[in-house]
Amino acid sequence: MGKYQVMKRASEVDLSTVKYKAETMKAPHLTGLSFKLFVNLLEAPLIGSLIVDYLKKDNGMTKIFRNTVIPEEPMFRPEFPSQEPEHDVVIVGEDESPIDRLETALKCLPQYDPSRSLHADPVSSFRYWKIRDYAYAYRSKLTTPLQVAKRIISIIEEFGYDKPPTPFLIRFDANEVIKQAEASTRRFEQGNPISVLDGIFVTIKDDIDCLPHPTNGGTTWLHEDRSVEKDSAVVSKLRSCGAILLGKANMHELGMGTTGNNSNYGTTRNPHDPKRYTGGSSSGSAAIVAAGLCSAALGTDGGGSVRIPSALCGITGLKTTYGRTDMTGSLCEGGTVEIIGPLASSLEDAFLVYAAILGSSSADRYNLKPSPPCFPKLLSHNGSNAIGSLRLGKYTKWFNDVSSSDISDKCEDILKLLSNNHGCKVVEIVVPELEEMRAAHVISIGSPTLSSLTPYCEAGKNSKLSYDTRTSFAIFRSFSASDYIAAQCLRRRLMEYHLNIFKDVDVIVTPTTGMTAPVIPPDALKNGETNIQVTTDLMRFVLAANLLGFPAISVPVGYDKEGLPIGLQIMGRPWAEATVLGLAAAVEELAPVTKKPAIFYDILNTN
């Protein structure tokens, strides 16, 4: 008989006895021919199961799911108790139109001052153009949406000649973009723009439905089996505000990776260093924003897929509370860890896009009973209106578990500035069972994904998937029903730990990632790669927000010694997006000057 352990209930665990254990995931790093051979072995009937069982045992998953008694009941999706109202916020209605919510959001921002952007000294420092810069330029007749569209199209059409290629987009229709831009230009000529998003270019990740494009999820074949009949719920809201939908962004195939590697369409390069990954899976969304081609994009986040590429590309990425945005019309619809959220070149722009797309589905309103959406009051340029004296939870040993001290040092510098400038208090916390959380997340995201795609795989489409997706699926197939139930018992247990932490702090702060953008191995471009250590480093801090459904944001806080961006993650209580956004605004003001990426297009330069 094998040995087993019995966990105490979470309420009985003495946190003073918890010891931090650095993650050391074990698996070979493979690319090229060796990777192809490894995948073929994984999929072989007998030897494949032996390899998978060995990897799971060697990385502690067998012990967690087969040799542990977990006393908590399962929680199959995030469940939140009712929350205390956020302080000094503006409450908006779930049923308000996106246009009305945008008007409310604009009133929460500092008054627009063209001298700080469009009329600022162009050589003093680099800056990204914001949504309100475009809106002002259109209203002032400095340019038109059609002129901007033609400039963007000319750049996109040159992508195929870039060395190395920069495939930001999977689907792009120049005629469709021109059609939208002409309609927006007419509205401005008639003095009737719909909203501040009228004429603003937004890119949509390829797992979110957006007419007239098919949705492939980064595959080459999914459109053959899944047709797109209408816009997704979030895209419909953006379209109703006058946004110009640029196309479908590249992504790590089916969201099954954190680097952004995609051998089907080419791997998107990091605008700060084209030899490096963007992070994923919302790789194209992050890169096209970081490169200046559009102010914002939509991504999905099931395991850091908005926050990781945002951090690695030096932009802002918001992961909303589970259920805050309607997932209808996305490949993630029906999942228990995924959300749709904005990626933007500034906190302000992420806030505006969030204001447009928020709104729970009718099912989530009934089941989750979300608190009313709230906006922070960002009425000063230093964010002081929005944060007050927040308590910032920091688990120091975890916070410092990064590949380079540059990351923890830059994040620590910002925490000190928040304390000195805004009176925030850093509170030491303990986050138990991080290894168990990683294991529970793998099953919670992997099993539903595999289940939704199994009919296609059984029909022969598995061979059309990339090798890294096939690696993930081979592991997911090994999980049993009892493994899945055990993971959901861990979800309830981990929820109790975190809700108790939030009794003593307002947010939990960490670096967004445990490393900056990794180098792309040349052999990985054709057939992908498997590198569990890179995956572990990139996902180290992001999982609680997905497994437990909390809101979280990545905001840039500086650069490492190689000039690569570093992100700070702020994770809040359920439904507390206003707190997270308000603190992120203060961080943005305190962070060092933004560096111009190596790949950047100055779309709105009217000089």
From Swiss-Prot:
Catalytic activity reported: N-(5Z,8Z,11Z,14Z-eicosatetraenoyl)-ethanolamine + H2O = ethanolamine + (5Z,8Z,11Z,14Z)-eicosatetraenoate; N-(9Z,12Z-octadecadienoyl)-ethanolamine + H2O = ethanolamine + (9Z,12Z)-octadecadienoate; N-hexadecanoylethanolamine + H2O = ethanolamine + hexadecanoate; N-tetradecanoylethanolamine + H2O = tetradecanoate + ethanolamine
Reported effect, S305A: Loss of activity
Location relative to the cell: Endoplasmic reticulum membrane; Cell membrane
GO molecular function: fatty acid amide hydrolase activity; N-(long-chain-acyl)ethanolamine deacylase activity
One Pfam family in the UniProt entry: Amidase
Biological process (GO), any one: N-acylethanolamine metabolic process
UniProt xrefs under InterPro entries: Amidase, Amidase_CS, Amidase_dom, AS_sf
Hydrolase listed as a keyword: yes
One GO cellular component term: endoplasmic reticulum
Membrane-crossing residue ranges in chain numbering: none
Keywords carried by this UniProt record: Cell membrane, Endoplasmic reticulum, Hydrolase, Lipid degradation, Lipid metabolism, Membrane
Catalytic machinery residues: K205, S281, S305
PROSITE patterns for the chain: AMIDASES
Gene3D superfamilies attached to this UniProt entry: Amidase signature (AS) domain
Regulation affecting activity: Inhibited by methyl arachidonyl fluorophosphonate (MAFP).
Family, similarity comment: Belongs to the amidase family.
PANTHER family for this protein: FATTY ACID AMIDE HYDROLASE, TRANSAMIDASE
UniProt name for this protein: Fatty acid amide hydrolase
Organism lineage: Eukaryota, Viridiplantae, Streptophyta, Embryophyta, Tracheophyta
Primary gene name: FAAH
